[in-house]
Amino acid sequence: MCGIAGIFNIKIQSRELRNKALRMARKIRHRGPDWSGMYCGGSAILAHERLSIVDPQSGGQPLYSSDRKQVLAVNGEIYNHRDIRAQYAGRYEFWTGSDCEVILALYRDKGIHFLEELNGIFAFALYDEEKDEYLIARDPIGVIPLYIGKDAEGHVYFGSELKALEGFCDEYEPFLPGHYYHSKEGTMKRWYTRDWMEYKEENDKQADSRSPTRQIQDALENAVHRQLMSDVPYGVLLSGGLDSSVISAIAKKYAAKRIETDGASDAWWPQLHSFAIGLKGAPDLIKAREVAEYIGTVHHEINYTLQEGLDAIRDVIYFIETYDVTTVRASTPMYLLARVIKSMGIKMVLSGEGADEIFGGYLYFHKAPDARAFHEETVRKLSKLHLYDCLRANKSLAAWGVEGRVPFLDKEFLDVAMQLDPEIKMAPGKVIEKKVLREAFADMLPSGIAWRQKEQFSDGVGYSWIDTLKKITATAVSDEQMAHAAERFPIHTPMNKEEYYYRSIFEEHFPSESAARSVPSIPSVACSTAEALAWDTAFKNLNDPSGRAVKGVHEEAY
């Protein structure tokens, strides 16, 4: 994981602007502690903080075209870069082995209309010095964070995290996933569109002769295999839940051979390391241990105490840049775990984010009234992932210079999984959620894991973690403070004391209105969208993101 920051639309280059860009970049150096690079020329400044994963020796950034007329700063991984390189063999002169350099080749060939060619996670800024134009773009789902801003002088700012823009420009906002901004057009435009974003009554998408479980199995194994490309040690996050267990089992299947040689040579680090964190005796730790023993990873179990978690919250909110209750709850143990992972020399981990959104894994999905409602909710959840789980996974890990990859959100896998008939994914009543995913990988996991009920990460690390947070924040925030919450926080007024507590810390770090508006604030039950609250009358009086809020479904419901 890297960090990018910079300024466009510069009329006259100055030392002051260059120093400003340097200060912006320093704010996100935790994302890329290995090297710093900067371009300053024409009407642009591009800064890059590097975490070296692919081609550590020559892949420093910014990257330049062979004639140095185009310059590029990227935070991301392009998983199909070898295929693209092959297409441009003899047509484009590559200077490095960096996976991201293919963006320059594509731009030189196709102009700005090349983004669909990429399969990867990315946020980038490209400056064409010859044309004095620039292009900013973000990956389809928003796995990689990106923000865009402006000032009164007409400068356009960009940064991997909002802390790179806070105090440096007049206003900013999250850069939308699946969008690009081209200086000639002057507005953000969508580049990523799919037929599955709209529900179709007549399911004409099942042309594939393979069973749904076989389609899922093949597509996910291919996604994990693609995402194992690395020139540095890597591992897997293994919570003991279904999603991380599936990813870990597939990764273990391919870990012994080097992906970059198509399995022709042994892997540089053939032992796959898995990592789990929780309070002592937490449900996740017990299950993670069972999975690790079954699939054969070198497993590392990290315990943290309630006090250690509480002590970290202020730092966690600074790094993850949100006051969303669910995200803070889940980010804290992940932040603590990332520190241990980095201390062991691991720079990249695979994680299980995205499966619940794709397959309707959150427990409230049991209440979906029909296939249309179910499918439309999965699409809504995917469209908001950049504000929640993607943000958590990326920034919690990046705080310690660790990159997170998410195979469930692989572009090709999404097209397979989201085109399945939603009836196949539904789990009415007591039917277990994500049944099609469980069936696809049941033979790779212990039975007790393959058919284990969904636990949200913040629950699975230990129920007392959430219970303690509720208790502490209920005491720390008075009834009078809550009564006047709208006066103190007119933008996205906190809906409960826990949110008020996190919001107060967030405001200390990021006092601007832009920062406040960058965080979503909606009623939710078990991580639902606001629209899904209509599925059950019991949801109307609830605002609790924990899965235990879904009575009649969760085995340990309140």
What does each model-identified segment do?
Residues 17, 95-99, 118, 209-216, ...:
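Hydrophobic (often cysteine-bearing) scaffold residues that line and stabilize catalytic clefts
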Residues 1, 8, 343-350, 369, ...:
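Adenosyl-5′-phosphate
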Residues 314-318, 364-366, 464-467:
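Short low-complexity, flexible loop/linker segments enriched in glycine and/or proline
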Residues 340:
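Adenylate-forming
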Residues 1-323:
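Cysteine-centered catalytic environments shared across enzyme families
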Residues 324-328:
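Acceptor-substrate binding/catalytic loop of class I
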Residues 346-356, 362:
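Short acidic/histidine-rich active-site segments
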